[in-house]
Regions:
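Small-residue-rich segments within alpha-helical transmembrane domains of MFS-like 12-TM solute carriers
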Residues: 29, 33, 127-135, 166
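Short amphipathic helix-loop junctions that connect adjacent transmembrane helices
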Residues: 37-53
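Central cavity-lining transmembrane alpha-helices of secondary-active solute carriers
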Residues: 58-73
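Glycine-rich segments within core transmembrane alpha-helices of 12-TM secondary carriers
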Residues: 64, 151-176, 191-192
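C-terminal ends and interior cores of transmembrane alpha-helices
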Residues: 89-114
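Intracellular juxtamembrane helix-capping segments at the cytosolic ends
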Residues: 132-146
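Symmetry-related core transmembrane helices of the 12-TM Major Facilitator Superfamily/SLC fold
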Residues: 182-201
Length: 220
């Protein structure tokens, strides 16, 4: 296949919702990997959790990466669009609350609850919301590509995931240097807010064959 033929396939071989979903994924990955790049240092030095910071950051990632199989049940029930909006809404609140822990405005709340308890609660909230993203976007890619274009579709998806993973920490470094480490989390929260709006305006529930509905009983 020539470069011109490949470009033509990329340009015409996918439904609009495919590109919307992948654009949402790109910016979600920018927000996630940006916050992940500073999370342990932020919790240790800015919030003051010291040696507990690594444990909490590790637990956050473990929960985030282990829940999508269960989150798929929710996505099956409520659809991609509503699940994406819920995901970004939880991310928006979660990143904001994590960032609040390192700001003067949040000190009274964290001191009242206890820093560790507060951070653990908001990290788990954020992880639960984040678990919804992968079933939504992967499912959308599967439903908006044909058998012929599916391999290319997933290649584009993983390329954008990797691109977000590469650029996110670089942007986080600039925000940290210019504004402060806590504002990396606030920028991730703002990005998530914009993703809610983008999903509401541009994302359309993809058609395609309806598979067997999953339930929690079937998953476990």
């Amino acid at each position: 296949m020539t470069i011109a033929e490949r470009w033509q396939e990329i340009r015409t071989g996918f439904q609009p919702t495919f590109w919307v979903a992948n654009t949402l994924e790109l910016f979600e990955r920018l927000a996630y990997y940006g916050s992940k790049a500073v999370l342990t240092v932020y919790l240790a030095n800015k919030v003051g959790l010291n040696e507990e910071a690594g444990q909490l950051a590790g637990l956050f990632n473990a929960v985030l990466y282990s829940l999508p199989i269960v989150a798929g049940v929710i996505v099956d029930k409520y659809g991609f669009r509503r699940s994406l909006m819920a995901c970004f809404a939880i991310f928006c609140v979660g990143y904001f609350l994590i960032g609040l822990a390192g700001m003067e405005y949040g000190q009274s709340i964290t001191e009242a609850i206890g820093k560790r308890n507060y951070v653990l609660a908001v990290l788990m909230l954020t992880a639960v919301g984040g678990s919804l993203i992968k079933p939504c976007v992967v499912g959308t890619v599967a439903k908006t590509t044909s058998e012929k274009s599916q391999a290319l579709g997933f290649s584009i998806y993983y390329t954008l995931v990797n691109l977000g993973g590469a650029i996110g920490p670089l942007l986080a470094y600039r925000v940290r240097a210019d504004l402060g480490i806590e504002y990396v989390l606030m920028m991730s929260s703002l990005t998530s807010l914009l993703l809610i709006i983008g999903t509401f305006i541009f994302f359309r529930e993809p058609g395609g064959e309806v598979g067997e509905k999953k339930t929690f009983g079937k998953v476990f």
